């Protein structure tokens, strides 16, 4: 099992039929769920599942299903459409995560993208932050060129 960073194939088709709305004030609710190294996430992932989702080693910083993302309305960076989210922090956290899945909580928990952290990331009684990259044509977490 492994996590590989990819825009999910199902998402590519679903945006063409209007399944996903990233508009900040009136769009769908998107969430980010964290997973262990035993998870299998990547381009073929179609929906969120609790299988191999992380659990707290102590405390209650992380809840099943993950955190709700705050999005900015999609924009153009040159000729590339980009979408961005506010960084997510889990405070007083104790857990280990190897990657995550962004998914549409409004529309059937459909997968948007999987992100591999490159290795296990562990936090013990601290703050675990997911920092999203700059929302431009080269770096945005979701880009359509």
Positions of predicted regions on the chain:
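Small cysteine-rich, disulfide-bonded extracellular modules of the LU/uPAR three-finger superfamily
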Residues: 1-98, 105-145
């Amino acid at each position: 099992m492994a996590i590989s960073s990819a825009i999910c194939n199902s998402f590519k088709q679903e945006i063409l039929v209007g399944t996903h709305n990233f508009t900040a004030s009136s769009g769908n609710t998107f969430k980010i769920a964290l997973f262990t190294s035993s998870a299998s996430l990547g381009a073929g992932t179609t929906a969120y599942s609790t299988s191999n989702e992380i659990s707290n080693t102590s405390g209650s910083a992380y809840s099943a299903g993950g955190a709700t993302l705050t999005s900015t309305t999609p924009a153009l960076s040159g000729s590339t459409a980009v979408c961005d989210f506010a960084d997510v922090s889990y405070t007083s956290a104790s857990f280990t995560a190897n990657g995550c899945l962004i998914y549409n909580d409004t529309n059937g928990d459909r997968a948007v993208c999987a992100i591999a952290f490159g290795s296990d990331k562990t936090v013990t009684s601290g703050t675990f932050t997911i920092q999203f990259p700059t929302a431009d044509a080269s770096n945005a977490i979701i880009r359509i060129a």
